[in-house]
Every structure is written in structure tokens, then in C-alpha cells.
Amino acid sequence: MSAELIAVYKDEQIIDLESAKVLGLSDGIKALNGTEPIYFDDSPLALEVIRHSCAHLLAQSLKALYPDAKFFVGPVVEEGFYYDFKTASKISEEDLPKIEAKMKEFAKLKLAITKETLTREQALERFKGDELKHAVMSKISGDAFGVYQQGEFEDLCKGPHLPNTRFLNHFKLTKLAGAYLGGDENNEMLIRIYGIAFATKEGLKDYLFQIEEAKKRDHRKLGVELGLFSFDDEIGAGLPLWLPKGARLRKRIEDLLSQALLLRGYEPVKGPEILKSDVWKISGHYDNYKENMYFTTIDEQEYGIKPMNCVGHIKVYQSALHSYRDLPLRFYEYGVVHRHEKSGVLHGLLRVREFTQDDAHIFCSFEQIQSEVSAILDFTHKIMQAFDFSYEMELSTRPAKSIGDDEVWEKATSALKEALKEHRIDYKIDEGGGAFYGPKIDIKITDALKRKWQCGTIQVDMNLPERFKLAFTNERNHAEQPVMIHRAILGSFERFIAILSEHFGGNFPFFVAPTQIALIPINEEHHVFALKLKEVLKKRDIFVEVLDKNDSLNKKVRLAEKQKIPMILVLGNEEVETEILSIRDREKQAQYKMPLKEFLNMVESKMQEVSF
């Protein structure tokens, strides 16, 4: 079965076998010019087809178990697939095995999956009385609607799908959640069931192991256990509270970045949190991003709370006249921004409404784009290396709708390619995926569980300099428009720390650990020595805690281990008298003794091991 053809890939689109029949291509589908065959296996394109069909298998089973069920959408997503639906019946996660069993029943029936195409009028009539399907159709333009059938079940869908349910043998329903209709909290709440599917038993087994590991590493769970951050309903959804340990972790990263940025010629700047709406109209945010912004009125003047830092940095640039000798100008800011995210998509620190970007904007001449991007790529590599992340780059090129002439776009895109080539970075190309105002490079990191995360971006902008009439005096004493490069490597501190927490499972490396050393005095008479040692370490910029509660030694050691503290020092008579310390080293997975002076030299050295 693994060699069976299930679809083809052509013009960045998957065409399943049923769609090929509708298009009259079924006889020559393999011979179509420019097609890539998709076989039944665990490749990304095949999994997209498999998981889409498994979503329909889920809906078919739900309809059989709960006849009043109505269905909204059931897409393939990064973590598998889901289906949003509603029913008068109460459904909990305890019902998932029953639903899964029904899915296996239908799969074993080897039902053919067929497709027909209806007009809008026919589709509205076919799904008469189904307000959820009518809601789906209202968001689709055109007059052609695909309907897929398997057995007595049918669903409005554009595909792609497998030719038969017999392919669906290795799947698992993973969780149940609530989801607002269309992600809008003003709409009714639907039930959402998530699932995963693979072509092979091994693929499913490996994934389920990864899921269990991911649950242990969930940053929301670790945030509570390690006292890093919290959320409070009285404050509001998507607005994190940084607790002392989390703030220490974050500040350490900020400080390391700041040191590196200053050495790399960046200047710190700071813009206001709210700006008049007039300036957002000039930038285009008011017309194109308004629904994601928060607004307030002061003295009858409308202000917008900034969703991005770029306008403030533009105003810094405009605060003085510039010549070519001043360029490049590199401004950075840990800028707090606010974006109106729908409550249904909020997720711990990964998706919040207030966050801080490691933002920078570079104003340079066109000829300086390559060298500036090259420097950013070098900076990115050092940061990713320090945090033990592998990463990949994706270059997005000119979309169909864009500003600027072909020559300008070609030069900008070529500059990005040459910078990537200079650093011998393999990269993917997203043809037409750039912003309308310039090409970009996306930075995607891979964590310890082999999950990919979108973090940083390097974006060439030829739009905002034009909108704000930015200029510098060139060598010929003429006014010339600079290029603006938007640059964020981490993306946001919130998102990066969430990913970092899950990458290390809370076992942060020594140089950023929120508590780096735990001092455990065995008895009260050892407490004074512990406090003195704490002060010595604090002067070396080490985060230290003294665990001096009236608990047993074993309990205090377990507490330090549970808090994932890299080094634990147990202080008793011998340590106090000889100043030879007993060290439990998490990173080395060893216990050893070391004279105090040598230990201090070691921790100082560990703090200096990492620089960006």
C-alpha cells in the first residue's frame, strides 16, 4: 500500500484523484507536465491528504453517534487536524475512545471517497437548515463548491482527500476543546476535537511519544512549577505577569543581547506606547491593521496603542538630518506592543496580547542591504548556537500585488540571496510570499522535539520610507530615499522564552537559569556561611537562593532538583571549616568537591562562555 498513488502536486496545489476525475485528468494524471506524484507514506504532502480525510472520518463518526451534530470546518493544521462542530449532547474527553472506535469501524468498511461539484444555489439547497455550512459558504467566493461523500456521509470541502477510507488505519484523537465560531469570541462556542494520523504505525508511535514528552515540557506547566510567569483573569486574557524568576531569566537574555547589540553598532532608542491615529494613517496601519489595534481618545484626539515599533523608529530617524556618512543607522528597542488577538488563539506565552519584541530597524542605502543582512545572519547564528537551536531560513519573494519597479525588487532580493550564500546557509524560497513592500527572510528554529517554530524576520521595506518621505543626502549632494530593514531575531521575548522552556524542559543552561546556584546549609550554624557565600556570588552576577527552611537535607535537595537549579551546594561543618565545597552539578550529572576560590573562578568562566 505504501507505493499507491493518492494525489499529485502541481502549481503549489495538491490535486487528489477525485479532483482529477472532475477535471478530466484521471487517465493522464501521472503524465501531467510539472506534476509531482504523492504516494501513500509519511511525507508532508501525503500527510496533508491523509489527515484531511481523517478529519472527515471523524465527522462521519460523530454524525453516526450524535445524529443532531452540525459541522463547521475541519482543516489540517500543524499538529494534525481538527473538526469544529456542535451537538446538544454533552461530550468530554472520556468520549474520545468511543468516537475513535467508530472511526475504525468506518475505515474497515473500505468506503470509496467520491466528489461532486455544485453551484452555490445547489450547495445552499443541499445543506438547507445547516447554519454552520451556510456560514462556511458565505466566506467562499465563486460559484463552484466541492462536496465529498463516503458512505452516507457528505461534507462541503475543497479537498484534497484519499480515494478510500481503507487507507486510514493509524490515527489517534488527541484532545477536546472549545472554540468560538470563526475564532470570534462574540460568536457561539463550538466543540473542537483534535486528532493525528499517519500512513504508518511507526509514524503514529513516534508522534505519540513526542506528544507525551511535549506535555511534560509544556511551558504553561513549567511556568507554574518553576515560578516563571502567571496569568490572572482579573487582569485579562493574554496579558502575562512575569514573576521574579521569570523576570530574571528574561532580563539575563535582554542584557546579553544589549551587550552584543552595542558592540555591533546599534543605538538604543525608545518610542511612546501610544501615538496619534494620524501617524498610523500615514503608515498604512490604520487602513490595513486597525482590527488588530487598540484605540483610545485623549482631548478629543484618537490615539492608537502601538502594535509595532517601526513608526517610533522612523520618527527617531526624522529627528535629525542625515547624510550618506551617517548610514547605516541601527536603532534597537525592546518595544512593548499590543495586538488584539482573538481569545480562541491565545496560548500561554506563545500567543499573547501584550508582548515585547527584540526589535531593530536599520536605515541604510540600497548598496548596504547585503552587508547589513549578512551581519544580521551572523548575529542570528551566534544566538541560535548559544541556545543550542538548529534553524533554517526561508526567503520570500515578490508577490503579485506589490509596489516598486522590477529592478528595485530584483536588486533587493539578490542582496538577500547573496547574504545567505555568503554564510553558506541553505534556504527555501517562498515564491510570491513576500510583503507587498519588499522581500524578507524568515528564521525558523527547531527545538529538541524536532518541532519548527517561526521566530525572527529580516524584512526589507521600501514602503514606509516612501510614505514618511525619509531622505538622506548622498555623495552627489542630492536627496536620496533610504531603505529600511525591520529585524527581530527572537521575535518576542514571550514567545522565545516559551520555546526555550520547552526546548530545555525547564533545565535552562547555567548562563540564563533563573536560579543558577542553590545553597543548602545542613544546620543553623552553617547558615551564616551560606549567606556570606550568597553575597560573594551575587557580586559576580550569579542568581543564588539559600534553601534554609526547617526541612530535612534530602527534602531541600529534592526541592532544588525539582526547581531544575543547575548547581546545588550542600554546606556542612567540613565545607565551612575547609572552604572546600560539595557540588551537585546537573549539567555534568556528577557530584564533586572544589575549593571555594576555584569554584568562583569556574562560575565566572561559565558566565563568560556565552556571548552573541
UniProtKB/Swiss-Prot annotation:
Protein encoded by which gene: thrS
Similarity comment: Belongs to the class-II aminoacyl-tRNA synthetase family.
Names of the cofactor(s): Zn(2+)
PROSITE patterns associated with the record: AA_TRNA_LIGASE_II
Subcellular location: Cytoplasm
Protein name in the entry: Threonine--tRNA ligase
Record-level Gene Ontology MF annotations: ATP binding; metal ion binding; threonine-tRNA ligase activity; tRNA binding
Keywords, in A-Z order: Aminoacyl-tRNA synthetase, ATP-binding, Cytoplasm, Ligase, Metal-binding, Nucleotide-binding, Protein biosynthesis, RNA-binding, tRNA-binding, Zinc
Gene3D superfamilies reported for this sequence: 3.30.54.20, Anticodon-binding domain, Bira Bifunctional Protein, Domain 2, Threonyl-trna Synthetase, Chain A, domain 2
Residues reported to bind Zn(2+): 310, 361, 486
Organism: Helicobacter pylori (strain P12)
SUPFAM superfamilies for the chain: Class II aaRS ABD-related, Class II aaRS and biotin synthetases, ThrRS/AlaRS common domain
